[in-house]
Structures are given as C-alpha cells and as structure tokens.
Design a protein with these regions (language model features):
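Conserved small/polar residues in nucleotide/adenosyl-binding loops
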Residues: 218-224
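Short, surface-exposed beta-strand/loop "edge" segments at domain boundaries and coil↔beta transitions
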Residues: 57-60, 113, 196, 203-211
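Beta-sandwich interaction modules
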Residues: 39, 175-189
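Solvent-exposed, flexible loop/coil segments flanking beta-strands in beta-rich domains
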Residues: 3-86
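Extracytoplasmic/secretory-pathway segments with low complexity and glycosylation-like composition
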Residues: 56-58, 72, 101, 120-130, ...
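Noncatalytic modules at the cell exterior or secretory-pathway interfaces
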Residues: 43-51, 189-202
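Low-complexity, serine/threonine/proline-enriched polar segments
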Residues: 80-164
Length: 228
C-alpha cells in the first residue's frame, strides 16, 4: 500500500475524544491528555498554551501546524538551523518548515532538558524494538488527534520532544535517558500565528525516556489557554 500520511495503523481513544468538536478550547479550562494518547487544540495568534507534567516522568511529543496550511508545520530541522544548537531554552522562537516563527517558549519551570533531534515513535520503530502486535505510538496519536477535529495530516513531522532527555556526547553519539523534569513542571508556549497544536503523552516503554524500572505512565494537563 502506498504511504498515506493520515493513515493510522491502529487506534485508541485519541480518535474519539477531542477536547471539542472544532478543536477550540474554553479559555482557562483544564484539559487532560490521558497516558498513551494525544489531543489537538487550535490556537489564535497570541494564545498561551501551558503544559504540565504531573508526575515529572512523562515525555510530551509536541507538534504544531499553521491553520493556514497543514503543509506548514513546526520544523525541527529548521529550528536547529535557526537556533544554532540542538537544545532549546526559555525565550527561544521555534520556526516552521518555511522558516516562519510559530511558537515561542515563554516560560519553563523544568531544568530545561528537552529534545529536538529524535523522530516521534511509530509502529515501525516498535517493530525494530521487537514488538509484533500493535503498540500505541506518537505518530498515530498525531494523526488521530487531527482527524478527531476534522484535519487530515499531510505530513508526520519530527516533534519538539518536551522533557525528553537525549544527551549528546563529544563524539556525536547520544543516549536515551530518563527525564530530569520533576512533578508539576510546566512549559508555556505562545502561538506566534494561528495554529493547531498536537500533543502526545508518549507511550514509549522499551527505552528509558519515560523513566526507568516500573514506569507509571501518566496524563499531561493543559491547565491554561489564554489570550494576551
């Protein structure tokens, strides 16, 4: 079968439980992103989206597309070029694949360890890791979260991996490590253009990126969406 960007290999409640039918949130309302699922929310330019990590060990794969065109999206390759580094800091502006500003990191209460190198997990990744059955994954969560609010994915871009800890060594090698974020950490992102943000509570359980040992997957929360 020819590759279809919007096709999901399996499904979970992401497909059936959008935050609203049209994707717009009620201002100031708290929304949950259940463990192993994703949600999409439409933002107006100037809106501030705050994401909270209740237990501290949950990675959030964050994507954003312009409302003008789903073919213009947050581009990690372009962000690395624009920033001149492979890490992000509070105050950084993240750009699209067309190099236009889309999101600004306006506050980060965590130690600031996030990733802009690693692709989102998908079913082929879990096949490589030895999984034979369906496994929840961030690529499908992205597709389903968009479908749930009436948008068809035209690409599956690399995400901004919030709280993912991928240290890079002097020789260029990197490793998969547990998050250094702590319970209750938040990150606040300001929309610099009308866009749709998609967040996946990463279900990766075969590498340490969501913690080590008996990992307790948790939800993420979106406590605040407000206009400035």
């Amino acid at each position: 079968m020819a590759y279809q960007p919007a096709h999901h290999d399996g499904e979970n409640e992401t497909l059936h439980a959008p935050i609203s039918a049209d994707g717009y949130a009620e201002k100031g309302q708290e929304y949950l992103i259940p463990a192993r699922q994703g949600r999409a929310v439409k933002l107006h330019q100037g809106d501030i989206l705050q994401i909270t990590n209740p237990q501290g060990n949950q990675v959030c794969d964050f994507f954003a597309l312009t409302l003008e065109s789903s073919a213009e999206f947050l581009g990690m390759e372009q962000c690395r070029t624009s920033l001149g580094r492979v890490y992000v800091n509070q105050g950084d502006v993240l750009v699209t694949n067309r190099r236009r500003p889309l999101v600004e990191i306006i506050e980060d209460t965590s130690p600031g360890v996030h990733d802009i190198l690693i692709a989102c997990c998908d079913l082929p990744r879990y096949r490589d890791l030895g999984v034979s059955d369906y496994h929840d994954n961030c690529a499908d969560n992205f597709r389903m979260a968009l479908t749930a609010i009436g948008i068809e994915a035209t690409h599956v871009p690399s995400p901004f991996n919030i709280w993912m800890n991928i240290p890079v060594k002097e020789d260029g090698a990197y490793s998969w490590e547990a998050p250094v974020s702590k319970a209750g950490d938040t990150i606040s992102l300001k929309a610099l253009a009308d866009c749709v943000a998609v967040m996946s509570a990463c279900p990766q359980d075969l590498t340490p990126v969501n913690g080590v040992g008996a990992v307790s997957y948790t939800h993420l929360t979106l406590p605040t969406i407000c206009s400035v």
